[in-house]
Swiss-Prot record:
The protein's name: Pyrimidine/purine nucleoside phosphorylase
Database matches in InterPro entries: Ppnp, RmlC-like_jellyroll, RmlC_Cupin_sf
Catalyzed reactions: a purine D-ribonucleoside + phosphate = a purine nucleobase + alpha-D-ribose 1-phosphate; adenosine + phosphate = alpha-D-ribose 1-phosphate + adenine; cytidine + phosphate = cytosine + alpha-D-ribose 1-phosphate; guanosine + phosphate = alpha-D-ribose 1-phosphate + guanine
Gene coding for it: ppnP
Assigned protein family: Belongs to the nucleoside phosphorylase PpnP family.
Source organism, top-level taxon: Bacteria
E.C. designation(s): 2.4.2.1, 2.4.2.2
Function: Catalyzes the phosphorolysis of diverse nucleosides, yielding D-ribose 1-phosphate and the respective free bases. Can use uridine, adenosine, guanosine, cytidine, thymidine, inosine and xanthosine as substrates. Also catalyzes the reverse reactions.
Top-level taxonomy: Bacteria, Pseudomonadati, Pseudomonadota, Gammaproteobacteria, Alteromonadales
Cell cycle as UniProt keyword: no
Enzyme class: transferase
Length: 103
């Protein structure tokens, strides 16, 4: 199991898509932030306001990255990077978890 140490965690979850996606913000002493999220089965579109690295913690996602037409699969232990101010889609058939690091 991977641990995040010496952090502060937001008590209130970020809830999206009528509760089908939920995440918690994690704050580090150096001022950086990550979010840890759980995604119920479905298809969702997200937008970024800053660069992100999305790491799949459990399960798998199919991802339609910006400016692409082919879905790519990312499973536990893999990651993908997103630029600022882009939109992307994810879909999954079972509950999956992610960790988002902001660039």
């Amino acid at each position: 199991m991977s641990l995040l140490e010496q952090v502060s965690v937001s008590k209130k979850a970020n809830i999206y898509f009528d509760g089908r996606v939920a995440s918690r913000s994690v704050f580090f002493a150096d001022g950086s932030k990550q979010t840890l999220g759980v995604v119920q089965p479905g298809e969702y579109e997200f937008s970024t306001s800053q660069g992100e690295i999305m790491e799949v913690i459990s399960g798998r996602f199919e991802v339609l990255l910006p400016e692409t037409t082919t879905w790519q699969e990312f499973s536990e232990g893999t990651q993908f990077e997103l630029a600022a101010n882009v939109s992307f889609k994810i879909r999954n058939t079972a509950i999956a978890e992610y960790c988002c690091s902001y660039l």
